[in-house]
Amino acid sequence: MNFTLHVTDGRARAATLELAHGSIPTPIFMPVGTQASVKALDHTDLLEHIDAPIILGNTYHLYLRPGDENIAKLGGLHGFTKFPRNFLTDSGGFQAFSLNTNTKHSEEGIIFKSHIDGSKHLFTPEKVLEIEYNLNSDIMMVLDDLVGLPAPRERIKESIERTTRWAERSLLFHQAQKEQGKALTNHLFAIVQGGTDVEFREISSKALVGLGEFDGFAIGGLAVGEPNEEMYATLEYTTPWLPKHKPRYLMGVGTPEDIIEAIDRGVDMFDCVMPTRNARNGTLFTHFGKLSIKSPRYKLDENPIDSECDCYTCKHHSRAYLNHLYRSGEFSYFRLASIHNLRYYLNLVRGAREAILSRTWAEYRRQFYAKRGADEA
């Protein structure tokens, strides 16, 4: 892996991340393909209509179904899906946290029940990496101890201490694999925890950086119930503690506004189900704000979703047609709406990158907000 930082404009960064399955210009938004598939889309959409250099798969879900060992027999995620570009896999800790009421955390790992059949499973830091090796992920996330917010201070303290110990176990396990000539193209990211507490974020960041050579650092435990202002403040004081020569990934975030504010605070990578989930539910993102395509007001609207969008959907179809497809329950709506929302997100970060490279980031950010709420949406 190679990470080259080209330009910093304020704290916003433009860089290139080189991985085994292609280069990734940052800032970057990564579409979420939980089940090794971005919902409603195929590879032609991802490669041609959206041009995504990296997508996410989820360790928890793929371990349970179809099984990581089965995927390994079929050539890992790339052989299994035939998607030729990069995969990042989450550790599954968030799903164990969010999908199961009977999850138990211990020093060994996370015990959880399958949401599919109720069977019990144990995720340890080492087990998670073994799964991710089977998936042959380009970027692997370590297992972390996630806490929902608000949470007692003692629970957050326990979380960062356990996350650090698990990260150390992950790093030692990964280094042992590399010493045997294995896992040479699987790159490991640590995850900073600490809630919205400045002291805890500093402790977590410095502890993880001090462990050794992680390939990148994620900021986890945000967008889990705290106000946006607290999330932005947390990013403001967390990113300076992370190495400048390593990529920074804000997990599970978020709205276009969240992404703009995180880029402004030095974050490079993002993922979220929002663009595809909102698309399926009738909410489309535009340069002028959100648009509810289910509204009767669009029944005779011949305009594209967004006059400034270059996506396949906006080039070929009107708001009226999308309104009809949604209200009729047509499956084609899900594809066309998802193409648009993901293209909007990818164009948002591409525009940010161009602005940073030309040192006009402040103006790009200003223009982003100036257009929000205009009548067009």
Swiss-Prot record:
It catalyses: 7-aminomethyl-7-carbaguanine + guanosine(34) in tRNA = 7-aminomethyl-7-carbaguanosine(34) in tRNA + guanine. It is an enzyme of class 2 (transferase). The active site is at 90 (proton acceptor), 271 (nucleophile). Pathway: tRNA modification; tRNA-queuosine biosynthesis. Binds 1 zinc ion per subunit. Substrate binds at residues 90-94, 144, 193, 221. GO terms for molecular function: metal ion binding; tRNA-guanosine(34) queuine transglycosylase activity. One of its GO terms (cellular component) is cytosol. Its cofactor is Zn(2+). Residues 252-258, 276-280 are annotated as: RNA binding. Transmembrane segments: none annotated. Belongs to the queuine tRNA-ribosyltransferase family. HAMAP family: Q_tRNA_Tgt. Homodimer. Within each dimer, one monomer is responsible for RNA recognition and catalysis, while the other monomer binds to the replacement base PreQ1. This is Queuine tRNA-ribosyltransferase. It comes from Wolinella succinogenes (strain ATCC 29543 / DSM 1740 / CCUG 13145 / JCM 31913 / LMG 7466 / NCTC 11488 / FDC 602W).
